[in-house]
Amino acid sequence: MKKRIWKIVSAALCMIMVMSQTVFADSIMGGEKEYVSLGADLSQKEKETVLKLLDIDNLEDYDVEYITNKQEHEYLDEYLSKSVIGSRALSSVRVKEGGDGIEVKTYNISFCTEGMYRNALATAGMENAQVTVAGPFNISGTAALVGAMKAYESMTGEKVSEENLDAANQELVVTGQVAESIGEEEAEQLMALVKEKVVSRGAESVEDIETIIDESANELNIKLSDEDRARIEELMQKISDLDLDIDQLKEQAKDIYNKLESMGIKFNEGFFTKLKNWFLSLFDFLR
């Protein structure tokens, strides 16, 4: 009996090793080239300021895209007033392949925190990347998500789902709005927790999502206004329609989820976590 189990385990481990080697080889072939998205309306002086903040000496060494104000309005008009978005594209982003999950740094960004970007970028589908967001002076930074994902598309050669990008933009805006009422860190944690529960439970109905929002707010000792609750509910309706991998989501925004776990929050296990735990249990049995 144990011999047969060992054969199954050996075969499974071989398959995992082959898959890991393939991914590793792909990462070597892909290299670690860096990509930049610049606001198309930056003046020369503003551009110099942004490049300095992004730690870029020679722009020719990078794959560069320019994000227009028209693109910013296309993605954000549904969630922000035109006056907030403005008439100039200024947000600029540098993206480097590699790292452990999504790592974010910001400069001159007043509305969006690093955690908010990390949460939203994970929703959009970004994986294992180092992201730096900068403005020439204090700006909201809400449009930077568009630039980050456009740079990510260039880096991976894969088109980002419009549905995921739309949900991520709404998530960034809603988290920022909720933060004005309950605080930045609290908003980051609440959004991450609600999203995890919605995705892991496969919640789709308004009633189920509202229950999750209330449950999560209670766990974090947060009191939500009716307006903020409605904003989150509308966003989660959209997120529930996306094909998000809960393991990947938690891996990419691990700083937030690790903090929640340290606070005593327990999460449902995703497929790969269950698989890992199954192997561990099996090895314990075979000892």
Residue ranges and their predicted role:
Residues 39-42, 109, 140, 186, ...:
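Catalytic cores of large soluble enzymes that bind and process phosphate-bearing ligands
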